[in-house]
Structures are given as C-alpha cells and as structure tokens.
Amino acid sequence: MKTRKGIILAGGSGTRLYPVTMAVSKQLLPIYDKPMIYYPLSTLMLAGIRDILIISTPQDTPRFQQLLGDGSQWGLNLQYKVQPSPDGLAQAFIIGEEFIGHDDCALVLGDNIFYGHDLPKLMEAAVNKESGATVFAYHVNDPERYGVVEFDQKGTAVSLEEKPLQPKSNYAVTGLYFYDNSVVEMAKNLKPSARGELEITDINRIYMEQGRLSVAMMGRGYAWLDTGTHQSLIEASNFIATIEERQGLKVSCPEEIAFRKNFINAQQVIELAGPLSKNDYGKYLLKMVKGL
C-alpha cells in the first residue's frame, strides 16, 4: 500500500477575525482547551497519517514550530513550508510538491474541526483508495458560503460550484480532502479563478469529470465546525467543552491519539504530561495511561 502524507493549510490573514488575529494566527487561537491546529492535526492522526506538512505564513510559521516542533513527541514527522501569499487552497500541492514526492496525500484546512464516533472508519476507505480523490459532504443550512456538490438519484456527484448564489443542493464540501499523486500536476496546470486563486473546487471538478471523485457523506451524528467568525469560535469552544465535561474524555487530544494508535508508549505520555501536571489536561493524560 502506498504511503499517504498529510498537509495542514494554516495560512491566510484571518481578517474576518480582526482584531483578534492581528498579531496571532487564527489556527493558534484556543478552541476550549487546545490550540485550534490540534483539531485538524488530530484528524490526520486518526486517519493513521504520520508524515505531515504544515503550511503557514512567513510570520506565523516560527510560532507553529515553537508549538509543535518536529512532531516526534507524538510519533509524527512534522515539516513546515511557507505560503508567501494566500493564492488559493490548491496552491498547497505546489508548495508541498517536494514533500509529497511520489506518495498520495490528504489535505485538511487548519480551521476545520471534525467530530464523530465513526470518523476514523469514514476516513479509512479514503485512505485505502488506490487512485482518485475522496471529498466529504455535509448538509448545511447556508450552502452559499461553501463549495457545493450536487448529486444525481444514484448519489453520484454531477456538479461542483464554489460559493454559488443559487446552490443546487445543501451539501457543502468540507475542508478535508484525500487525493492520489496526480493532484500535484493538476494543481501546477490549474488556471487562477476570477478571484485570482487556485481553487480546490476546480481540482475536485477535474477528478469528477474523469470519473475518479468519490464523495463520502458525513451524515447525522457528525459535526463539522468552521471557525471563521467570532461567533463560530465561541460556538466551537462551547461544543467541545460540552462533550468533554459530560463524558470526561478529551476531543482531538494528540497525546491520547498517539498513545492509542501505538505511535508512542505510556512512558512517553507520562513525560509529556509532566509540564502540564498542574492543569486538567495533564491530569487527564496521567489518568489515561494509568487506567484509573
């Protein structure tokens, strides 16, 4: 089976969140008890992906390196690349060409939070897909804000539109994408859209026209949270807090995921918990490995 590498796109200027993001990356803001980037990172980890490239702005990349390091503490290999200007999501594959090499890849947006009991199982088919692409569709109330996918009666994708004024369905394409290696050349040959960006929707449309696009449904029981506004930041934090306080279990905790997937051992978790031992996060890690 081919290796699949992951990319987290954590760039952008975050202007919709000004003044909050005037001096700090949006993806470093807290979502309840963790930095935002822990959530997309955890999504890739749950898919079994351990080689991950983080793409961010020139000013924010050193901050991500300070927070995450080389990933070895979680049994990962993290690398970093700079996106000088936000020229579209598909630019990630051009920036990451050397990192991707001859492997398949997955892209997750740094401000997207995914939650659901069967999320690893849902991603498994995409991870194991030998060729083509897989995107994930989610029913939303305001599809005009997103890339929208339209289905025929058999559930096959027949159209993709980016932020349409008159959406043909209520199904948005989420910020999680799995591609085979041909995505790199597609991105390099892509023409900028009317707004001057290399659109991920255009990549997905090429796969669709080739008959190589799979659409997996994130149905009821899944949460897909977009954290692009002040209100959605609060809502995401409240959502995570409600689940964690009710269950006594963490959502998107990289240390726990790494431990449960055997990326790291119990002793390594205990060492990671040391500097955090005075707060609930560190206590949770210690309790988890001791099985109390």
UniProtKB/Swiss-Prot annotation:
Q: What is its EC number?
A: 2.7.7.24
The Gene Ontology biological process annotation of the record reads: dTDP-rhamnose biosynthetic process; O antigen biosynthetic process; polysaccharide biosynthetic process
Task: Kindly indicate whether the keyword Transferase belongs to this entry.
Answer: yes
**Pathway(s) per entry:** Carbohydrate biosynthesis; dTDP-L-rhamnose biosynthesis; Bacterial outer membrane biogenesis; LPS O-antigen biosynthesis
Q: Identify the cofactor(s).
A: Mg(2+)
Subunit comment for this entry?
Homotetramer.
Protein name per the record: Glucose-1-phosphate thymidylyltransferase
Whichever gene encodes this chain, its name is rmlA
